[in-house]
UniProtKB/Swiss-Prot annotation:
Protein role: F(1)F(0) ATP synthase produces ATP from ADP in the presence of a proton or sodium gradient. F-type ATPases consist of two structural domains, F(1) containing the extramembraneous catalytic core and F(0) containing the membrane proton channel, linked together by a central stalk and a peripheral stalk. During catalysis, ATP synthesis in the catalytic domain of F(1) is coupled via a rotary mechanism of the central stalk subunits to proton translocation. Component of the F(0) channel, it forms part of the peripheral stalk, linking F(1) to F(0).
Species this protein is from: Nocardia farcinica (strain IFM 10152)
Segments passing through the bilayer: 25-45
Keyword Cell cycle belongs to the record: no
Subunit structure: F-type ATPases have 2 components, F(1) - the catalytic core - and F(0) - the membrane proton channel. F(1) has five subunits: alpha(3), beta(3), gamma(1), delta(1), epsilon(1). F(0) has three main subunits: a(1), b(2) and c(10-14). The alpha and beta chains form an alternating ring which encloses part of the gamma chain. F(1) is attached to F(0) by a central stalk formed by the gamma and epsilon chains, while a peripheral stalk is formed by the delta and b chains.
Protein name: ATP synthase subunit b
């Protein structure tokens, strides 16, 4: 500071230590202008380019994220649709199986009823055949017994077989009709 005072005393003017000399101001303005031109010409375009690239990447990332989200949403909807279709298919298969089971059950019941009816009919036919066989055997047995009893009662031989057979048949027919009227024997 002493130097400024000495210089100011020599020049004869009052020098303010806060205000620089004119040549310093000129050179400072020139340096600032050069730096501004360099910044404007080189630094700012590169900075703008980097910022634009970064913004593009961010926007591209956002677009990709939106596309991925839309694709994920579409995939989710397809999955839900497939799941709903699978549930409908499963319900249809269950219903088909239930219907088929009912048809099989009805068919088995019908077959069982037919088999039962066949067995009952065969049983009735067998019973009727046995009844007819027993009746035939009984008629001949009753006929012989009647002839034997008649011979014992009369004391002589009844030899006319045609008359014997006709008499026995008439007697048995009357017996059958009287049994049928009463409901006995059947």
């Amino acid at each position: 500071m002493y130097e400024y005072s000495v210089l100011a005393a020599e020049s004869g003017e009052d020098v303010n230590p806060l205000i620089p000399a004119t040549y310093d101001i000129v050179w400072s303005v020139v340096c600032v202008a050069i730096i501004a031109v360099v910044f404007y010409k080189y630094v700012i375009p590169r900075l703008t380019k980097v910022l634009n690239e970064r913004a593009d990447k961010i926007e591209g990332g956002i677009a990709k994220a939106e596309a991925a989200q839309a694709e994920a949403q579409q995939t989710l909807e397809q999955y839900q649709q497939q799941l709903a279709d699978a549930r409908l298919e499963a319900a249809r298969i269950r219903e088909d199986a239930r219907t088929q089971g009912q048809q099989i059950l009805a068919q088995m019941r019908a077959e069982a009823q037919a088999e039962s009816d066949r067995i009952v009919a065969a049983g009735h036919a067998q019973l009727e055949a046995q009844r007819q066989q027993i009746l035939t055997e009984l008629r001949s047995e009753v006929g012989r017994t009647a002839v034997d009893l008649a011979e014992k009662i009369i004391g002589q031989s009844v030899s006319d077989e045609a008359k014997q057979a006709a008499s026995i048949e008439r007697f048995l027919s009357e017996l059958d009709s009287s049994d049928a009227g009463i409901g006995v024997g059947r």
